[in-house]
Amino acid sequence: MDLKSLIRDVPDFPKPGILFRDLTTLLQNQAGLRYVIDQLVEKHANAGIDYVAGIESRGFIFGAPLAYRLGAGFIPLRKPGKLCAPVYAVEYELEYGRDRLEMHQDAIEPGRRVLIVDDLIATGGTAAAAAGLIQKAQAELYGFAFIVELTDLAGRQKLPDVPITTLVTY
């Protein structure tokens, strides 16, 4: 399936000079959404994944059905202040400042295998922070899965040396 044909390009969003890859058009396409989840399942079905960790917010959209299909638990990695129990937190750089990802401290048992999922990898800062959360929990980071990779931004170079799955590259 040609996934690029299902992804809308939005020039100058969220600011001038940025070409935004809008996955909402992929999500509304039943065959496209099914294909994406099926592809991710096929690539990770035999990896012994205990948990899928989805990065807020679009990582939730792809991560939860993937976890279900893999027979794994789902862990939401949230922006600051969204979780109600004690958290691990990792700060990361944005082009316009800093942000933070958080995860409940009791979300993952030490030694469990985790696959991190998000819709897109650009600079890699958010995904690297997610990996830091998994490390703080003393779990095993199995790998990453992204629908889209923006290769010019070299985000995968910031990530640990684990398997990285992408379905579409620009």
Swiss-Prot record:
Major localization class: cytoplasm
Catalytic activity from the UniProt record: AMP + diphosphate = 5-phospho-alpha-D-ribose 1-diphosphate + adenine
EC number(s) recorded for this UniProt protein: 2.4.2.7
Pathway: Purine metabolism; AMP biosynthesis via salvage pathway; AMP from adenine: step 1/1
GO CC terms in record: cytoplasm
GO biological process: adenine salvage; AMP salvage; purine ribonucleoside salvage
Molecular function terms from GO: adenine binding; adenine phosphoribosyltransferase activity; AMP binding
Keywords: Cytoplasm, Glycosyltransferase, Purine salvage, Transferase
PROSITE patterns: PUR_PYR_PR_TRANSFER (PS00103)
Similarity remark: Belongs to the purine/pyrimidine phosphoribosyltransferase family.
Role summary: Catalyzes a salvage reaction resulting in the formation of AMP, that is energically less costly than de novo synthesis.
NCBIfam families given in the database record: apt, PRK02304.1-3, PRK02304.1-5
Assembly: Homodimer.
Record-given protein name: Adenine phosphoribosyltransferase
